[in-house]
Amino acid sequence: EVPSRGLGDVYKRQRLGLTPDTASTQVISRDRHADYVQTLALIGASLDRFSTEIRNLQRTDVLEVEESFAKGQKGSSAMPHKRNPIRSERISGLARVLRSYVVAALENVALWHERDISHSSTERMMLPDCSVTLHFMLREMTAVVAGLGVYPGNMLRNMNVYGGVVFSQRVLLGLVDAGMSREDAYRVVQRNAHSAWNNDGGDFRRNLEADPEVTAKLSPCLLYTSPSPR
């Protein structure tokens, strides 16, 4: 139940968990408003980080995860095969809007003799807009996560591209454990990895198995390039 008008401020403070400012002039210091806006922008940046990763993982050549795609939905008017991560793209775009408000919030901190109201026009737009924007972004990310498609088979395929070249560190550490100096191990592994990378259809695992410097220390190399823990 909303209290009578005379107790309205008390009610709002209690609902929002706010306390009165113990030292203020005509206006409350705007550093706390700036802190609020920066916090919203930071949350938005985290959502942007998640959505950017989803967008990259949804690329056609990667396709390890994917936003839900409704029947009849269009990803591109020109390319019918596309299934664009529209929600994640929207989140990344709105995160930029949130970050743009941080500058305005910080510029509002310095007021003439701690009491002019130049901040007011900015805050009338900034505070409601950044609050509603973040709320919308959170709703969008919730929908993304709820409908996210995950493709373990494609993850395994990508890890095994070029014969498991992504496991080069495991080979490096295996050679070092077997007695090879780290500098020599790095040189040997890099040579075999780059050979697989630079040659179409190259195979890191086969390169290692054919390298006498490797086989003199490790056998079989498959133990160090397998995706499963050893």
Residue ranges of model-derived segments:
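Single conserved hydrophobic/aromatic residue that forms the stacking wall/gate
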Residues: 1-7, 11, 224-228
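Short glycine/serine/threonine-biased micro-segments
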Residues: 4-6, 15, 70-74, 177
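Conserved protein kinase catalytic domain
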Residues: 11-13, 172
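A short, charged helix-loop
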Residues: 13-25
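Glycine-rich anion/phosphate-binding loop at the beta-strand->alpha-helix junction
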Residues: 29-115
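Glycine-rich cofactor/substrate-binding loops
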Residues: 79-226, 230
